[in-house]
Amino acid sequence: MAQVQRMSRLMVKTLRDDPADAETLSHKLLVRAGYVRRNAAGIWSWLPLGKKVLDNISNVVREEMDAIGAQEVLLPALLPKEPYEASGRWEEYGDLLFRLKDRKGGDYLLGPTHEEIFTQTVKDQCTSYKDLPVMLYQIQTKYRDEARPRSGVLRGREFQMKDSYSFDTTDEGLAHSYALHRAAYIKIFERLGLDHRIVSAVSGAMGGSASEEFLAPAAAGEDTFADCPNCDYAANTEAVTFALAPVDGSAHGAVEELDTPDTPTIETLAAHLGVPASATLKNLLVKVDGEIVAVGVPGHREVDLGKLGEHLAPAVVELVTAEDFVGRDDLVRGYVGPQGLEKVRYLADPRVAPGTSWITGANKEGKHARNVVAGRDFEVDEYLDVVVVEEGDPCPKCGTGLVLDRAIEIGHIFQLGRKYADTFQLDVLGQQGKPVRVTMGSYGIGVSRAVAALTEQTADDKGLCWPREIAPADVHVVAAGKALQTELALDVSEKLNAAGLRVLVDDRPGVSPGVKFTDSELIGVPKILVAGRRSADGVLELKDRRTGEREELTVDEAIARLTADLA
């Protein structure tokens, strides 16, 4: 049984004012309530109350992972270079990796994620189809050298994460393991009290095919997702697609060259011709692994460079600079058009469908062209959905206008397939006596990030407001200050603890009742029990932290009520 936590002995220092550098609600409140302390940019200490919340979340995750048959392990955070070099992620992760050398000059990294090491572990431990399927997980610190760590524990350079991996001999087995994890994640986030959405996502540097994110809607979120109000479609904006729908372009006239001096931008061109930007074709030049590539999108839309990068990964995508036009007579800056670009690969968004007509650059200084028809006057080498998704864009599933919302990514699940198994030749002996290539899934939950997400969703103007399952205590008993009140508070705390409840009691001497009441709301335990003015009568005040409802109860009534409410 847990002991009663006495605040007179607990290392907790609350603050009245927000940290000067805090922007998000979770950053402000977790620091003010004494849950975390900043050591450096993106590096945080979890203090006693914060560590309890972190552990409670980890325990929920652990219980649900165990329930689907996953086995807990702990792999090293300090990892050798070679596996990540073999997978390509030593280079692909770039500056995001913390790299170091040992005293002998060997290259190492601090693990950002563990697909490579888990693959090698299973290759060593599992040699027959009889050893599979297997699901392994760990709860461990990850390290990523974020360029701009911010928002407190939402985006740190080290963070707590649950990562798990499934290993199967068939695609059907992978689909089953994926479904088990998906269902477990739903249970985990429901138990944590996190409002969440499951959305389609892209796999990014993780690789693989099917991918879904678990997002917690919050104003402080760094992710934007598209939600359909009419059907069940939801996707990260980088995963939203637009169907290619060719149109009949036979009625369009011949290409007409236009004199358009001093119109190198879509805005100046549209104003000069008196046409909407949507009638123009924007041709963005980028470098893909050093090769100049043109990307065509409607003039009133922006290219989503993240989306473009996902489509072209693992290639490196960069915007061109003025120097890239030197010696390129075929590229006229500000007047590029798709027609006649023989030396440049031309990619286009599906909105630039065959048969659509555009006003676009004529590849001559001060000149544009009208009636330039896709499929007639220029060919698209590849169609890629690359525009920034906007509010009201049609739902890919039903056509209703999409709604955009901000959210915090709290989980991500992937069907990796055989990407890493191929890299490390992960085979087992099959039923027919022949090697069978293993197929994998990868599944992550941001444990420390979930603390911040819950804060963003549940806190109010008074402070934190934890769901019971992850709160640092079930009941916060407050002794108003006098000796009799303190004696009653300690007595009822022991009785509540004996009844199986986790109790935090504020017995700090020399602290005013007002400060204690304010701290009880800031700390955010679900139930607050006050030994105050009626202590001599054996009467306490019970307050619900979330609703603010209050009632006076005797000691026995309070114990009965709390044990029933928190059972």
UniProtKB/Swiss-Prot annotation:
<dbReference type="InterPro" id="IPR004154">
    <property type="entry name" value="Anticodon-bd"/>
</dbReference>
<dbReference type="Pfam" id="PF03129">
    <property type="entry name" value="HGTP_anticodon"/>
</dbReference>
<dbReference type="InterPro" id="IPR006195">
    <property type="entry name" value="aa-tRNA-synth_II"/>
</dbReference>
<dbReference type="GO" id="GO:0002161">
    <property type="term" value="F:aminoacyl-tRNA deacylase activity"/>
</dbReference>
<keyword id="KW-0547">Nucleotide-binding</keyword>
<dbReference type="InterPro" id="IPR036754">
    <property type="entry name" value="YbaK/aa-tRNA-synt-asso_dom_sf"/>
</dbReference>
<dbReference type="InterPro" id="IPR004500">
    <property type="entry name" value="Pro-tRNA-synth_IIa_bac-type"/>
</dbReference>
<dbReference type="InterPro" id="IPR044140">
    <property type="entry name" value="ProRS_anticodon_short"/>
</dbReference>
<dbReference type="InterPro" id="IPR036621">
    <property type="entry name" value="Anticodon-bd_dom_sf"/>
</dbReference>
<dbReference type="InterPro" id="IPR033730">
    <property type="entry name" value="ProRS_core_prok"/>
</dbReference>
<dbReference type="InterPro" id="IPR023717">
    <property type="entry name" value="Pro-tRNA-Synthase_IIa_type1"/>
</dbReference>
<comment type="similarity">
    <text>Belongs to the class-II aminoacyl-tRNA synthetase family. ProS type 1 subfamily.</text>
</comment>
<dbReference type="InterPro" id="IPR050062">
    <property type="entry name" value="Pro-tRNA_synthetase"/>
</dbReference>
<dbReference type="InterPro" id="IPR007214">
    <property type="entry name" value="YbaK/aa-tRNA-synth-assoc-dom"/>
</dbReference>
<comment type="function">
    <text>Catalyzes the attachment of proline to tRNA(Pro) in a two-step reaction: proline is first activated by ATP to form Pro-AMP and then transferred to the acceptor end of tRNA(Pro). As ProRS can inadvertently accommodate and process non-cognate amino acids such as alanine and cysteine, to avoid such errors it has two additional distinct editing activities against alanine. One activity is designated as 'pretransfer' editing and involves the tRNA(Pro)-independent hydrolysis of activated Ala-AMP.</text>
</comment>
<dbReference type="InterPro" id="IPR045864">
    <property type="entry name" value="aa-tRNA-synth_II/BPL/LPL"/>
</dbReference>
<dbReference type="GO" id="GO:0006433">
    <property type="term" value="P:prolyl-tRNA aminoacylation"/>
</dbReference>
<keyword id="KW-0963">Cytoplasm</keyword>
<protein>
    <recommendedName>
        <fullName>Proline--tRNA ligase</fullName>
        <ecNumber>6.1.1.15</ecNumber>
    </recommendedName>
</protein>
<dbReference type="InterPro" id="IPR002314">
    <property type="entry name" value="aa-tRNA-synt_IIb"/>
</dbReference>
<comment type="subunit">
    <text>Homodimer.</text>
</comment>
<dbReference type="GO" id="GO:0005829">
    <property type="term" value="C:cytosol"/>
</dbReference>
<keyword id="KW-0648">Protein biosynthesis</keyword>
<dbReference type="InterPro" id="IPR002316">
    <property type="entry name" value="Pro-tRNA-ligase_IIa"/>
</dbReference>
<dbReference type="Pfam" id="PF00587">
    <property type="entry name" value="tRNA-synt_2b"/>
</dbReference>
<keyword id="KW-0030">Aminoacyl-tRNA synthetase</keyword>
<keyword id="KW-0067">ATP-binding</keyword>
<dbReference type="Pfam" id="PF04073">
    <property type="entry name" value="tRNA_edit"/>
</dbReference>
<dbReference type="GO" id="GO:0004827">
    <property type="term" value="F:proline-tRNA ligase activity"/>
</dbReference>
<keyword id="KW-0436">Ligase</keyword>
<dbReference type="GO" id="GO:0005524">
    <property type="term" value="F:ATP binding"/>
</dbReference>
